[in-house]
Amino acid sequence: MKHIVIIGGGFAGVSTAHRFLKNVGKSTTAPYKVTLVSRDSHFFWNIAAPRGIIPGQIPEEKLFQPIAEGFSQYGPDKFEFVLGTATDLDVGGKTLVVDVDGKATRISYDYLIIGSGSRTKIPGPFKSDGSTDGVKQTIHDFQERVKAAKTIVVVGAGPTGVETAGELAFEYGTSKKIILISGGPTVLENRPASVTKTALKQLETLNVDVRVNTKAKDPVTLPDGKKELTLSGGEKLVVDLYIPTFGVLPNSSFVPSQYLDSNGFVQVDQYFQVKGAEGVFAIGDVSDSEAPQFWFVEKQSVHIAKNLILSLSGKAPTPYKASATGMMGLQIGKNSGTGHFGNFKLPGFLVKTIRKTLFVENLPKTVDGSML
């Protein structure tokens, strides 16, 4: 029996497991079992986190769904869920070491898919940083702090920062001071100029105070609990709530260093196989294949699931063609948004309509595989 072990309870891991389990029986009668290893008991719909930190906007059950229940249709002979954290990988011995309730558990594999995702450089509400209980508590803490704050600064003007500032300003633009700090000359750097211009205008319409070409040093906590930031121009900015949205780090600490690039991302070839590691693959945010964006992860998941089935059927896998086309869509408050496909700017009404709910209705269908 072939044992496929998948690491990660996010989009990459859960989607790949479902796609394989739903389709493998159509192509081969070879015996198999899938084990999904996740440090989170629940799938976190972090796409909606910028709105989720605002009190009363999104109920907890629309942000979190239990993973194991979503795979109940396959039966214990075909699927097993392991709640634990990958701590070590023995490529030669085809063994993964997982910390399960403080105990080192060794799991042998024939194929290993690393879809462990990434985390923010500074822990916050946008990524899980260790457990479902932990990120739930972080969300609740931020909701309380947002409610109490009079002045909020969002540092980092990439998609997460822009969406977060937009959501906050839509709700509180006339009652709280919302500041967005960008280290570059505009927001959404490296996006088409028409998109950055539109985003900036929409933010300003919502009364966001956008500071460009501005760096912020790590904040100092004052005796009253407020945060003091020193900006690159020397200005001291005192705020009630500091929300960092810049930078992600791959969750690859368990992977031997020879398989990582200088930034810690897992190096893969055109088949998503980890370079130099037979039978080991990596997709999504943890790999060096494409930008860490949802639609790229979806494409990668489809491809790796098909290749796994081909391998079990004794057929050669097919190479993946990475996309050279940049794309983005983001909500800026509930009534505006912008985005692009390549150099083509998407109409704001289209982005707003598509992303109106931040896709929370797709959470249950993602976890149980019914939308794949």
From Swiss-Prot:
GO molecular function, one term: flavin adenine dinucleotide binding
Residues bearing attached sugar chains per UniProt: N251
Gene Ontology CC, one term: cytoplasm
Required cofactor names: 6-hydroxy-FAD
Pathway: Secondary metabolite biosynthesis
Details of cofactor binding: Binds 6-hydroxy-FAD non-covalently.
Binding site for 6-hydroxy-FAD: G8, G9, G10, F11, A12, R51, D285
SUPFAM superfamilies: FAD/NAD(P)-binding domain
Family annotation (InterPro entries): FAD/NAD-bd_sf, FAD/NAD-binding_dom
Pfam families: Pyr_redox_2
Induction of expression: The cluster is expressed in rice fermentation medium. Three regulators are located in the cluster (ptaR1, ptaR2 and ptaR3), suggesting that the production of pestheic acid is controlled by a complex regulatory mechanism.
Keywords in alphabetical order: FAD, Flavoprotein, Glycoprotein, Oxidoreductase, Signal
E.C. no: 1.-.-.-
Signal peptide start and end residues: 1-16
Family: Belongs to the FAD-dependent oxidoreductase family.
Known function: Oxidoreductase; part of the gene cluster that mediates the biosynthesis of pestheic acid, a diphenyl ether which is a biosynthetic precursor of the unique chloropupukeananes. The biosynthesis initiates from condensation of acetate and malonate units catalyzed by the non-reducing PKS ptaA. As the ptaA protein is TE/CLC domain-deficient, hydrolysis and Claisen cyclization of the polyketide could be catalyzed by ptaB containing a beta-lactamase domain.
Protein name stated in the entry: Oxidoreductase ptaL
The organism's taxonomic lineage, starting at the top: Eukaryota, Fungi, Dikarya, Ascomycota, Pezizomycotina
